[in-house]
Amino acid sequence: MRKTIITMLAFIFVSISGISYAENKVFALVPKAMNNPFFDLARDGCKVAEKEIGGIECLYTGPGEHTEQEQVQIVQDLIAKGVDGIAVASSNAAAMAKAVKGTDIPIITWDSDLLNKDAGLRAAYVGTKNYDIGVYLAQIVMMLKPNGGEICIQSGGAAAANHNERMSGIRDTIAGRADSGTYPSAALKGENGWTEASGCPLYTNDDFPLSVQQMEDIFAKHPNLTAFVPTGGFPQFVSKAFRRVTEKHADRISSMKTAVVIADTLPMQMEDLDAGRTHGQVGQQPYMMGYKAMHVLKDIVDGKALKFDNPSLKAIYTGLDVCMKPNIGSCIAG
Protein backbone atom coordinates (compact mmCIF):
# COMPACT_ATOMS: atom_id res chain seq x y z
CA MET A 1 0.00 0.00 0.00
CA ARG A 2 2.76 2.38 1.00
CA LYS A 3 4.61 1.59 -2.24
CA THR A 4 1.45 2.30 -4.25
CA ILE A 5 0.96 5.68 -2.58
CA ILE A 6 4.59 6.65 -3.22
CA THR A 7 4.23 5.63 -6.86
CA MET A 8 1.03 7.68 -7.21
CA LEU A 9 2.64 10.72 -5.60
CA ALA A 10 5.63 10.42 -7.92
CA PHE A 11 3.28 10.22 -10.90
CA ILE A 12 1.37 13.29 -9.73
CA PHE A 13 4.62 15.21 -9.20
CA VAL A 14 5.89 14.34 -12.67
CA SER A 15 2.53 15.27 -14.17
CA ILE A 16 2.47 18.63 -12.41
CA SER A 17 6.07 19.30 -13.46
CA GLY A 18 5.17 18.44 -17.03
CA ILE A 19 2.19 20.77 -16.96
CA SER A 20 4.32 23.57 -15.53
CA TYR A 21 6.94 23.09 -18.24
CA ALA A 22 4.33 22.87 -20.97
CA GLU A 23 2.82 26.15 -19.84
CA ASN A 24 6.11 27.97 -20.39
CA LYS A 25 6.06 30.11 -23.51
CA VAL A 26 9.01 29.28 -25.75
CA PHE A 27 10.52 32.34 -27.43
CA ALA A 28 13.37 31.73 -29.88
CA LEU A 29 16.20 34.22 -30.24
CA VAL A 30 17.91 33.52 -33.57
CA PRO A 31 21.27 35.25 -34.28
CA LYS A 32 23.07 35.37 -37.59
CA ALA A 33 25.76 33.07 -36.19
CA MET A 34 26.47 31.39 -32.87
CA ASN A 35 30.24 32.00 -33.15
CA ASN A 36 29.92 35.79 -33.06
CA PRO A 37 30.76 37.36 -29.66
CA PHE A 38 28.37 40.23 -30.39
CA PHE A 39 25.44 37.83 -30.31
CA ASP A 40 26.69 36.18 -27.10
CA LEU A 41 25.74 39.39 -25.30
CA ALA A 42 22.25 39.28 -26.79
CA ARG A 43 21.93 35.71 -25.52
CA ASP A 44 22.92 36.89 -22.04
CA GLY A 45 20.23 39.57 -22.07
CA CYS A 46 17.69 37.04 -23.30
CA LYS A 47 18.48 34.67 -20.42
CA VAL A 48 18.20 37.44 -17.83
CA ALA A 49 14.78 38.40 -19.23
CA GLU A 50 13.74 34.73 -19.05
CA LYS A 51 14.37 34.67 -15.30
CA GLU A 52 12.90 38.12 -14.76
CA ILE A 53 9.65 37.49 -16.63
CA GLY A 54 9.04 33.92 -15.49
CA GLY A 55 6.96 31.38 -17.37
CA ILE A 56 8.99 31.74 -20.56
CA GLU A 57 11.97 29.99 -22.08
CA CYS A 58 14.63 31.84 -24.06
CA LEU A 59 15.60 29.36 -26.77
CA TYR A 60 18.85 30.67 -28.22
CA THR A 61 19.49 28.89 -31.49
CA GLY A 62 21.04 29.68 -34.85
CA PRO A 63 23.69 28.69 -37.39
CA GLY A 64 27.08 27.73 -35.97
CA GLU A 65 28.63 30.07 -38.53
CA HIS A 66 27.13 32.76 -40.73
CA THR A 67 25.09 30.79 -43.27
CA GLU A 68 22.03 32.51 -44.72
CA GLN A 69 20.22 29.37 -45.87
CA GLU A 70 20.84 27.55 -42.59
CA GLN A 71 19.33 30.45 -40.67
CA VAL A 72 16.25 30.38 -42.90
CA GLN A 73 15.93 26.62 -42.35
CA ILE A 74 16.21 27.04 -38.57
CA VAL A 75 13.41 29.61 -38.57
CA GLN A 76 11.24 27.37 -40.74
CA ASP A 77 11.86 24.48 -38.32
CA LEU A 78 10.90 26.67 -35.34
CA ILE A 79 7.67 27.62 -37.09
CA ALA A 80 6.93 23.95 -37.80
CA LYS A 81 7.56 23.06 -34.14
CA GLY A 82 5.10 25.72 -33.05
CA VAL A 83 7.21 27.86 -30.73
CA ASP A 84 5.34 30.78 -29.20
CA GLY A 85 7.42 33.56 -30.74
CA ILE A 86 10.54 34.16 -32.81
CA ALA A 87 13.03 37.04 -32.71
CA VAL A 88 15.44 36.83 -35.63
CA ALA A 89 18.45 38.87 -36.75
CA SER A 90 17.97 38.47 -40.49
CA SER A 91 21.08 37.50 -42.46
CA ASN A 92 19.25 37.68 -45.78
CA ALA A 93 16.29 40.02 -45.42
CA ALA A 94 14.49 38.94 -48.60
CA ALA A 95 14.89 35.21 -47.93
CA MET A 96 13.77 35.60 -44.32
CA ALA A 97 10.64 37.45 -45.43
CA LYS A 98 9.67 34.46 -47.56
CA ALA A 99 10.34 32.10 -44.65
CA VAL A 100 8.04 33.87 -42.18
CA LYS A 101 5.29 34.90 -44.58
CA GLY A 102 1.93 33.42 -43.67
CA THR A 103 2.79 32.19 -40.18
CA ASP A 104 0.53 33.01 -37.23
CA ILE A 105 3.47 32.83 -34.82
CA PRO A 106 4.56 36.30 -33.59
CA ILE A 107 7.71 37.33 -35.46
CA ILE A 108 9.97 40.21 -34.51
CA THR A 109 13.38 41.17 -35.85
CA TRP A 110 16.39 42.36 -33.88
CA ASP A 111 19.78 43.74 -34.92
CA SER A 112 18.96 43.25 -38.62
CA ASP A 113 15.48 43.98 -39.93
CA LEU A 114 13.50 42.86 -42.96
CA LEU A 115 13.35 45.13 -45.99
CA ASN A 116 10.97 48.08 -45.68
CA LYS A 117 8.56 46.52 -48.16
CA ASP A 118 8.30 43.42 -45.95
CA ALA A 119 8.01 45.22 -42.61
CA GLY A 120 4.37 44.15 -42.27
CA LEU A 121 5.50 40.54 -41.84
CA ARG A 122 6.97 41.24 -38.40
CA ALA A 123 5.38 42.81 -35.35
CA ALA A 124 8.38 44.93 -34.34
CA TYR A 125 12.07 45.61 -34.83
CA VAL A 126 14.26 45.75 -31.71
CA GLY A 127 17.77 47.11 -32.02
CA THR A 128 19.94 49.86 -33.36
CA LYS A 129 18.86 52.52 -35.79
CA ASN A 130 21.37 51.11 -38.23
CA TYR A 131 21.55 54.09 -40.56
CA ASP A 132 22.73 56.19 -37.61
CA ILE A 133 25.69 53.87 -36.99
CA GLY A 134 26.91 54.84 -40.44
CA VAL A 135 26.25 58.51 -39.75
CA TYR A 136 28.39 58.46 -36.60
CA LEU A 137 31.16 56.41 -38.23
CA ALA A 138 31.28 58.98 -41.03
CA GLN A 139 31.28 61.92 -38.63
CA ILE A 140 34.32 60.54 -36.83
CA VAL A 141 36.12 59.95 -40.14
CA MET A 142 35.32 63.46 -41.38
CA MET A 143 36.50 64.99 -38.11
CA LEU A 144 39.79 63.09 -38.31
CA LYS A 145 40.28 63.57 -42.06
CA PRO A 146 38.56 66.86 -43.01
CA ASN A 147 40.22 67.10 -46.42
CA GLY A 148 38.70 63.91 -47.76
CA GLY A 149 40.54 61.11 -49.50
CA GLU A 150 40.09 57.44 -50.24
CA ILE A 151 37.83 55.30 -48.05
CA CYS A 152 37.24 51.56 -47.89
CA ILE A 153 34.04 50.34 -46.27
CA GLN A 154 33.99 46.76 -45.02
CA SER A 155 30.52 45.23 -44.64
CA GLY A 156 28.88 41.96 -43.62
CA GLY A 157 26.71 40.14 -46.13
CA ALA A 158 25.57 41.83 -49.32
CA ALA A 159 21.95 40.95 -48.48
CA ALA A 160 22.14 42.01 -44.81
CA ALA A 161 19.75 44.93 -44.38
CA ASN A 162 21.46 46.28 -41.26
CA HIS A 163 24.89 46.56 -42.90
CA ASN A 164 23.45 48.06 -46.08
CA GLU A 165 21.75 50.74 -43.97
CA ARG A 166 25.02 51.46 -42.15
CA MET A 167 26.90 51.71 -45.43
CA SER A 168 24.31 54.19 -46.66
CA GLY A 169 24.69 56.25 -43.49
CA ILE A 170 28.44 56.48 -44.12
CA ARG A 171 28.11 57.39 -47.79
CA ASP A 172 25.24 59.84 -47.40
CA THR A 173 26.84 61.69 -44.49
CA ILE A 174 30.16 62.06 -46.28
CA ALA A 175 28.44 63.12 -49.51
CA GLY A 176 26.14 65.56 -47.70
CA ARG A 177 22.97 64.00 -49.06
CA ALA A 178 19.71 62.95 -47.43
CA ASP A 179 18.67 59.42 -46.61
CA SER A 180 16.93 58.17 -49.75
CA GLY A 181 15.47 55.10 -48.07
CA THR A 182 17.17 52.87 -50.64
CA TYR A 183 19.99 50.70 -49.28
CA PRO A 184 22.81 50.61 -50.00
CA SER A 185 23.02 54.09 -51.46
CA ALA A 186 25.32 55.09 -54.32
CA ALA A 187 29.08 54.79 -53.88
CA LEU A 188 31.18 57.90 -53.28
CA LYS A 189 32.64 59.35 -56.45
CA GLY A 190 34.35 62.55 -55.41
CA GLU A 191 31.67 64.15 -53.22
CA ASN A 192 33.35 66.49 -50.72
CA GLY A 193 36.71 65.10 -51.82
CA TRP A 194 35.95 61.45 -51.04
CA THR A 195 36.17 58.41 -53.30
CA GLU A 196 35.93 54.70 -52.55
CA ALA A 197 39.03 52.59 -53.00
CA SER A 198 39.01 50.10 -55.86
CA GLY A 199 37.86 46.70 -54.69
CA CYS A 200 35.64 48.23 -52.00
CA PRO A 201 33.22 47.77 -50.36
CA LEU A 202 34.48 44.50 -48.94
CA TYR A 203 31.96 41.81 -47.99
CA THR A 204 32.98 39.51 -45.15
CA ASN A 205 29.80 37.43 -44.79
CA ASP A 206 30.70 37.53 -41.09
CA ASP A 207 33.78 35.38 -41.76
CA PHE A 208 36.14 36.96 -39.24
CA PRO A 209 39.46 35.47 -40.42
CA LEU A 210 38.52 36.55 -43.95
CA SER A 211 37.81 40.07 -42.71
CA VAL A 212 41.34 40.36 -41.30
CA GLN A 213 42.81 39.08 -44.55
CA GLN A 214 40.74 41.63 -46.46
CA MET A 215 42.03 44.38 -44.20
CA GLU A 216 45.63 43.27 -44.68
CA ASP A 217 45.18 43.07 -48.46
CA ILE A 218 43.52 46.48 -48.78
CA PHE A 219 46.22 48.13 -46.65
CA ALA A 220 48.88 46.61 -48.92
CA LYS A 221 47.05 47.49 -52.13
CA HIS A 222 46.28 51.07 -51.09
CA PRO A 223 49.26 52.55 -49.19
CA ASN A 224 47.60 55.97 -49.24
CA LEU A 225 44.22 54.78 -47.96
CA THR A 226 42.65 57.58 -45.93
CA ALA A 227 40.08 55.62 -43.93
CA PHE A 228 39.19 51.99 -43.26
CA VAL A 229 35.64 51.69 -41.92
CA PRO A 230 34.03 48.31 -41.11
CA THR A 231 30.29 48.41 -40.43
CA GLY A 232 30.74 45.71 -37.79
CA GLY A 233 33.54 44.54 -35.53
CA PHE A 234 34.53 41.71 -37.89
CA PRO A 235 38.35 41.99 -37.90
CA GLN A 236 38.53 42.84 -34.21
CA PHE A 237 36.70 39.66 -33.26
CA VAL A 238 39.88 37.69 -34.01
CA SER A 239 42.03 39.78 -31.72
CA LYS A 240 45.47 38.28 -32.31
CA ALA A 241 45.18 38.48 -36.09
CA PHE A 242 43.81 42.03 -35.98
CA ARG A 243 46.60 43.17 -33.71
CA ARG A 244 49.18 41.53 -35.97
CA VAL A 245 47.89 43.58 -38.92
CA THR A 246 47.70 46.83 -36.96
CA GLU A 247 51.22 46.31 -35.60
CA LYS A 248 52.46 45.76 -39.15
CA HIS A 249 50.96 49.13 -40.12
CA ALA A 250 51.51 50.85 -36.78
CA ASP A 251 53.19 53.93 -38.30
CA ARG A 252 50.34 54.81 -40.65
CA ILE A 253 47.73 54.14 -37.96
CA SER A 254 49.46 55.99 -35.12
CA SER A 255 50.19 58.96 -37.40
CA MET A 256 46.56 58.79 -38.55
CA LYS A 257 47.62 58.57 -42.17
CA THR A 258 44.92 55.92 -42.29
CA ALA A 259 42.01 56.40 -39.90
CA VAL A 260 40.54 53.15 -38.56
CA VAL A 261 36.96 53.63 -37.36
CA ILE A 262 34.85 50.56 -36.62
CA ALA A 263 31.34 49.70 -35.45
CA ASP A 264 30.68 47.96 -32.11
CA THR A 265 32.25 48.31 -28.67
CA LEU A 266 32.86 44.84 -27.28
CA PRO A 267 35.57 44.59 -24.59
CA MET A 268 38.35 43.54 -26.98
CA GLN A 269 37.42 46.46 -29.24
CA MET A 270 37.65 48.95 -26.41
CA GLU A 271 41.10 47.58 -25.65
CA ASP A 272 42.04 48.27 -29.26
CA LEU A 273 40.75 51.83 -29.00
CA ASP A 274 42.62 52.41 -25.76
CA ALA A 275 45.83 51.03 -27.29
CA GLY A 276 45.53 53.25 -30.37
CA ARG A 277 44.88 50.42 -32.81
CA THR A 278 41.64 52.16 -33.79
CA HIS A 279 40.62 55.82 -33.69
CA GLY A 280 36.91 55.46 -33.02
CA GLN A 281 34.21 52.90 -32.24
CA VAL A 282 30.45 53.30 -32.57
CA GLY A 283 28.82 50.87 -30.20
CA GLN A 284 25.51 49.09 -30.04
CA GLN A 285 23.84 47.43 -27.07
CA PRO A 286 23.35 43.74 -27.98
CA TYR A 287 22.55 42.79 -24.39
CA MET A 288 19.52 45.08 -24.48
CA MET A 289 18.46 43.66 -27.84
CA GLY A 290 18.17 40.16 -26.41
CA TYR A 291 16.61 41.43 -23.20
CA LYS A 292 14.00 43.61 -24.87
CA ALA A 293 13.19 40.99 -27.51
CA MET A 294 11.86 38.66 -24.81
CA HIS A 295 9.78 41.40 -23.21
CA VAL A 296 8.34 42.42 -26.58
CA LEU A 297 7.35 38.85 -27.47
CA LYS A 298 5.75 38.41 -24.05
CA ASP A 299 3.75 41.61 -24.51
CA ILE A 300 2.61 40.42 -27.94
CA VAL A 301 1.33 37.03 -26.72
CA ASP A 302 -0.32 38.76 -23.75
CA GLY A 303 -2.15 41.11 -26.11
CA LYS A 304 -0.48 44.25 -24.79
CA ALA A 305 0.12 47.29 -26.98
CA LEU A 306 3.76 47.87 -27.87
CA LYS A 307 5.45 51.22 -27.31
CA PHE A 308 7.52 52.17 -30.35
CA ASP A 309 10.27 54.76 -30.66
CA ASN A 310 9.33 55.00 -34.34
CA PRO A 311 5.67 53.99 -34.77
CA SER A 312 5.75 54.18 -38.57
CA LEU A 313 8.54 51.59 -38.67
CA LYS A 314 7.33 49.72 -35.58
CA ALA A 315 10.85 50.12 -34.24
CA ILE A 316 12.14 49.96 -30.67
CA TYR A 317 15.67 51.36 -30.48
CA THR A 318 18.34 50.28 -28.02
CA GLY A 319 20.75 53.20 -28.34
CA LEU A 320 24.30 53.91 -29.50
CA ASP A 321 27.62 54.91 -27.95
CA VAL A 322 30.09 57.05 -29.90
CA CYS A 323 33.55 56.34 -28.53
CA MET A 324 36.95 57.91 -29.04
CA LYS A 325 39.93 57.79 -26.73
CA PRO A 326 39.03 60.96 -24.75
CA ASN A 327 35.64 59.54 -23.69
CA ILE A 328 36.57 55.86 -23.50
CA GLY A 329 35.85 55.72 -19.77
CA SER A 330 32.20 56.65 -20.26
CA CYS A 331 31.52 54.26 -23.15
CA ILE A 332 29.69 50.99 -22.61
CA ALA A 333 31.72 47.91 -23.58
CA GLY A 334 29.14 45.82 -25.40
Provide a role label for each language-model segment.
Residues 7-16:
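Bacterial N-terminal signal peptides
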Residues 1-4:
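Positively charged n-region of N-terminal signal peptides that target proteins for export
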Residues 21-334:
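A residue-level marker of the well-folded mature domains of exported/periplasmic proteins
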